[in-house]
């Protein structure tokens, strides 16, 4: 579906790393769906499944099923094929 972002970002309002990832995505105009795991029980369960029981954020999930968990800016830029 063309209107559906390829990336789902699971994060939390209190998480500085989640804010950092959102800023990087926003600054490069990369569309994503944001789910706050403290406000969305289904999102919290998804993160726990992806991370083997841990509520690790930020967790990014691509449409192809690939994931990045708590990535550095450099690791995220490499995955996105962008320059910092």
Predicted regions and their residues:
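Local sequence-structure signature of Cys/Sec-based thiol-disulfide redox active-site neighborhoods
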Residues: 1-31
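Thiol-based oxidoreductase modules, predominantly thioredoxin-like and allied folds used
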Residues: 30-44, 54
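Short amphipathic alpha-helix with an adjacent loop that forms part of the alpha/beta core around
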Residues: 47-51, 79-82
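Structural micro-motif
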Residues: 51-61
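Non-catalytic, surface beta->alpha helical segment in thiol-disulfide oxidoreductase systems
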Residues: 62-84
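Short secondary-structure transition/capping segments
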Residues: 2-3, 45-48
